[in-house]
Regions:
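Extracytoplasmic electrostatic interaction patches
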Residues: 104, 108-176
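LRR N-terminal entry segment and analogous cap-like coil->beta motifs
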Residues: 78-122
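Bacterial Sec-dependent N-terminal signal peptides
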Residues: 1-27
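Short, charged/polar "capping" segments at the starts of alpha-helices
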Residues: 24-34, 98-100, 120-124, 147-152
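Recurring C-terminal helix/loop segment of individual leucine-rich repeat
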Residues: 50-53, 101-104, 129
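Sec-dependent signal peptide cleavage junction
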Residues: 18-86, 174-176
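Serine/threonine-rich low-complexity intrinsically disordered regions
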Residues: 2-4, 37, 46-49, 92, ...
């Protein structure tokens, strides 16, 4: 009787241990990203309740998106740099896997702007770990040329990296 009880307890302990290890592995391999529409981020409902840091971040994002900045463009394997110490990197989904080896001036990039060109690309992934060599990167901004939702963009985001804010915008028409 004692042997059976011991075996049952041992089996229960083993099962719980394996389950908890799998749960930990799953939670660290992918993270749920909070993707927000850029217009919602840039126009907070009540700026009086925003911290000074949050307001500075909003101003920084506005400046990066709307003001002329030194920029790198990387499309179809071709890197073009305009200005010294680029802060913006413009690219498309098809070019992401080559960014680490192709981009020469990474140290000052604060925002990567990724263009989605068709709805089939929503089935692809954006692995945030691809951006780990961009030391000053803070923002990922996804511009979609077709209707999409924050949830659809969230489903594309994989990889563990909590330091980036991820935004999106639907912008039909030519953005280049």
């Amino acid at each position: 009787m004692k042997t059976n009880t011991f075996i049952i307890l041992l089996f229960t302990f083993y099962t719980v241990t394996i389950f908890s290890q799998n749960s930990t592995r799953i939670s660290t391999s992918t993270t749920s990203r909070n993707v927000i529409a850029i217009d919602d981020y840039l126009t907070p409902l009540n700026s009086a309740n925003q911290s000074a840091v949050a307001l500075l971040n909003i101003q920084n994002v506005k400046s990066l998106i709307y003001d002329a900045q030194p920029s790198t463009y990387y499309f179809s394997g071709v890197e073009k740099i305009y200005g010294e110490k680029p802060k913006n990197l413009f690219t498309d989904l098809n070019s992401l896997n080559n960014l680490n080896s192709a981009i020469t001036l990474k140290n000052n990039i604060e925002i990567i702007i990724i263009k989605l060109e068709n709805a089939n690309q929503l089935n692809s992934t954006i692995n945030l770990e691809l951006f780990s060599s961009f030391k000053n990167l803070k923002y990922i901004y996804i511009i979609s040329s077709f209707d999409t939702t924050a949830q659809a963009i969230t489903n594309m985001i994989v990889g563990k990296n909590e330091i980036y804010s991820v935004f999106y915008k639907v912008e039909k028409g030519d953005t280049n």
